[in-house]
């Protein structure tokens, strides 16, 4: 089983750790976070306002974080180059600070003995992989990869199924996205993105997202055919993608439902879900799929122009894909 270090014990770092313990697919052996001491880590891992209390045991013992009886080495280094991943036995590192997202910056982990780095965010220059879409293109010459964004992980599997069957001529995506840590609780300064600094709990905030364009990186045939934007809304978790696209081949809405349902039960099982229930966002909290197609919410104007709706737990679904990508990479060693 691949031995993993986690850099940055924030929302994604903690939930990747949860996903690892829930699934038993990878072995977390080390965690680095300069801003959270050991006893605070115990507390933050045990209690989660969004996903509830951890079902298991968590304690501090002999300077280590012990989860379900497993001792995890703790580092508190600010510079990734100084983290001794090798000493802790970690061969893969999940880079989940949100800070070191380029090949050069994430590459610092290799100095401490890590063999590979998985960036849990989009990257300007690291190759991006989306499970179920282009993960087969991974080869073990790559030392640093990106798991793309939560929104790209929601959109890409759906876009792939639609494009494979009907062809996407062009499309626009909107994600109605839950609050994340980069937003402000009340109005505050926010660099160049003035709107992003407005109070998260009070507003619907139009924002930019590279998620749709990134689909063109993981599905090259769609490069230049998709773009999109986001609305940040005052909910703590779970987001929804609205993909409005023009189809090459004519398709009845029922035809679209059929192919998505087949994909959800076949090649994309566990990644792309399908529901005909009258669901709302809360129903997907702690859901492990990358994307769940909402058959009842979509609409068709005609056989060539459709609006498709897909839900995602932007925290937990994504964190589970980080684990799955590491398992896939390990299978190629």
Curated annotation (Swiss-Prot):
Catalytic activity annotation: D-glyceraldehyde 3-phosphate + phosphate + NAD(+) = (2R)-3-phospho-glyceroyl phosphate + NADH + H(+); S-nitroso-L-cysteinyl-[GAPDH] + L-cysteinyl-[protein] = L-cysteinyl-[GAPDH] + S-nitroso-L-cysteinyl-[protein]
Family membership noted in the UniProt record: Belongs to the glyceraldehyde-3-phosphate dehydrogenase family.
Domain of life, per lineage: Eukaryota
Free-text comment about domains: The [IL]-x-C-x-x-[DE] motif is a proposed target motif for cysteine S-nitrosylation mediated by the iNOS-S100A8/A9 transnitrosylase complex.
Active site: 150
UniProt modified residues of type S-nitrosocysteine: 150, 245
Organism per entry: Sus scrofa (Pig)
Subcellular location(s) of the protein: Cytoplasm, Cytosol; Cytoplasm, Cytoskeleton; Nucleus
Modified sites of kind Cysteine persulfide: 150
The record's account of how the chain is modified after translation: ISGylated. S-nitrosylation of Cys-150 leads to interaction with SIAH1, followed by translocation to the nucleus S-nitrosylation of Cys-245 is induced by interferon-gamma and LDL(ox) implicating the iNOS-S100A8/9 transnitrosylase complex and seems to prevent interaction with phosphorylated RPL13A and to interfere with GAIT complex activity.
GO molecular function, one term: NAD binding
Residues with the Phosphoserine modification: 120, 146, 149, 239, 310, 331
CDD domains: GAPDH_I_C (cd18126), GAPDH_I_N (cd05214)
Protein name: Glyceraldehyde-3-phosphate dehydrogenase
Activation and inhibition: Glyceraldehyde-3-phosphate dehydrogenase activity is inhibited by fumarate, via the formation of S-(2-succinyl)cysteine residues.
């Amino acid at each position: 089983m691949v031995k993993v270090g986690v850099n940055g014990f924030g929302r994604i770092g903690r939930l990747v750790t949860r996903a690892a313990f829930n699934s038993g697919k990878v072995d977390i052996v080390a965690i680095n976070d300069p801003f959270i001491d050991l006893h605070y880590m115990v507390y933050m891992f045990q209690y989660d306002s969004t996903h509830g209390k951890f079902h298991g045991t968590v304690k501090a013992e002999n300077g280590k974080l012990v989860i379900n009886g497993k001792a995890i080495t703790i580092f508190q280094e600010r510079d990734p180059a100084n983290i001794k991943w090798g000493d802790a036995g970690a061969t893969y590192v999940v880079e989940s600070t949100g800070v070191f997202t380029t090949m050069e910056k994430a590459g610092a982990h290799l100095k401490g003995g890590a063999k590979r780095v998985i960036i849990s965010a989009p990257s300007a220059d690291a190759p991006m992989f989306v499970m179920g879409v282009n993960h087969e293109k991974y080869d073990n010459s790559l030392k640093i990869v990106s798991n793309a964004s939560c929104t790209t992980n929601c959109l890409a599997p759906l876009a792939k199924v639609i494009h494979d069957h009907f062809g996407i001529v062009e499309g626009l995506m909107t994600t109605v996205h839950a609050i994340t840590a980069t937003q402000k609780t009340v109005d505050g300064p926010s660099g160049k993105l003035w709107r992003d600094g407005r109070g998260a709990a009070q507003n619907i905030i139009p924002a930019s997202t590279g998620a749709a364009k990134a689909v063109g990186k993981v599905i090259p045939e769609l490069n230049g055919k998709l773009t999109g934007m986001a609305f940040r809304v005052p909910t703590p978790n779970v987001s929804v993608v609205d993909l409005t696209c023009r189809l090459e081949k004519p398709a009845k809405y029922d035809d679209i439902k059929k192919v998505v349902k087949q994909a959800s039960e076949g090649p994309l099982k566990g990644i792309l879900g399908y529901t005909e229930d009258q669901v709302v966002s809360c129903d997907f909290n702690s859901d492990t799929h990358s994307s769940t197609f909402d058959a009842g919410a979509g609409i068709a104007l005609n056989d060539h122009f459709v609006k498709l709706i897909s839900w995602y737990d932007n925290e937990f679904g994504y964190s589970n894909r980080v684990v799955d990508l590491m398992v896939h990479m390990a299978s190629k060693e």
